[in-house]
Amino acid sequence: MDLRVIENLETELAIEIEGEDHTFMNVLKGALLELDGVTAATYDVNPEQSGGQTEPIVTIKTDGSIDPLDALEQGASRVRDKTDAFEEAFEAAA
């Protein structure tokens, strides 16, 4: 997975995440929206409306109480924690 910063402002961050699709992006967006200080988290994977863009771009907006890069790091940690919890539950059920 390669990341490319599109825009990095004080309260807004846009990053292209190469090789991912709706499955991962929805989970990441949900984790970001659970964070205090994140006012919006969206992603775009629409090549028709984006001039041929095929890799997803996640956009994070904050209220200024959290840096958008820190929010991305915390959101990714939440995804990892949820994945680990699911794996443990799955193994226990098998």
Swiss-Prot record:
* Complexes and interactors: Part of the RNA polymerase complex.
Between which residues do disulfide bridges form? none
Q: Which CDD domains match?
A: RNAP_L (cd06927)
**Keyword entries, A-Z:** Cytoplasm, DNA-directed RNA polymerase, Nucleotidyltransferase, Transcription, Transferase
Matching SUPFAM superfamilies: RBP11-like subunits of RNA polymerase
Kindly indicate whether the keyword Secreted belongs to this entry.
no
Annotated TM spans: none
The record's comment on protein family reads:
Belongs to the archaeal Rpo11/eukaryotic RPB11/RPC19 RNA polymerase subunit family.
Q: What does this protein do?
A: DNA-dependent RNA polymerase (RNAP) catalyzes the transcription of DNA into RNA using the four ribonucleoside triphosphates as substrates.
PROSITE patterns linked:
RNA_POL_L_13KD
* Protein localization: Cytoplasm
The Gene Ontology biological process annotation of the record reads: DNA-templated transcription
Q: What is this protein called?
A: DNA-directed RNA polymerase subunit Rpo11
User: Where is this protein primarily located?
Assistant: cytoplasm
Species of origin: Natronomonas pharaonis (strain ATCC 35678 / DSM 2160 / CIP 103997 / JCM 8858 / NBRC 14720 / NCIMB 2260 / Gabara) (Halobacterium pharaonis)
What are the recorded GO MF terms, alphabetically? DNA binding; DNA-directed RNA polymerase activity; protein dimerization activity
Q: Give the EC number(s) listed in the UniProt record.
A: 2.7.7.6
InterPro entries per UniProt: RBP11-like, RBP11-like_dimer, RNA_pol_Rpb11_13-16kDa_CS, Rpo11-like
Please provide one cellular component term from the Gene Ontology annotations of this protein. DNA-directed RNA polymerase complex
Q: Does the keyword Cytoplasm apply?
A: yes
Name the reaction it catalyses.
RNA(n) + a ribonucleoside 5'-triphosphate = RNA(n+1) + diphosphate
